[in-house]
Amino acid sequence: MEEVKRIGRDLKYSGSIVDVYTDHMLMPNGNTAEWDYVEHRKGAAAVLPVLDNGNILMVKQYRSAVDCISLEIPAGSRDSVTEPTIECASRELEEETGYRSDNLEFLINVATTVAFCNERIDIYLARDLQPSRQHLDENEFLDVYEYSPEELVNMIYSGEICDAKSIVAILAYANKYLR
């Protein structure tokens, strides 16, 4: 495949989590093109919390980008670029579900939107969950639900779960541990 080269980049917006750029690209045929690019500055982590009975905890929350309630695994941005993703996953588990775990295991990494964003999410499996206390952020509103892995797989294929990180986590877990 012939090489595409970035020949320039203009910052269009800088926010607390992302920066938005227009990239100026030189195409193999000599033409130039403009591509939008979103840089997720801190990175993120997510966690698939598995209860002792084998069920999985999920959260429902409103997502403005898709203007609907989304069923997802707990996740969030790292506090800084130096925060280990396992610490971020552990924090998000307790903040969002009210459970904690000392047994987090790396499951998979996913690039969420390769066409225009560099966001990568490390996803962890949490077992041996212990009840704790939910610590939602001031403007974070979500509910916690419990589902069997089979229910979640069916919800993926029926379109009830559309969040990419959650789909990847559930299917990776099912493939690795439930076969």
Residue spans of the language-model regions?
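Nudix hydrolase/Nudix homology domain
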Residues: 1-7, 69, 125, 139-179
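The catalytic Nudix box helix
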Residues: 58, 73-106, 124, 136-139, ...
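Conserved hydrophobic/aromatic beta-strand scaffold that supports enzyme active sites
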Residues: 20-24, 48, 58, 123-125, ...
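Short loop segments at secondary-structure junctions
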Residues: 29-30, 51-55, 62, 127-131, ...
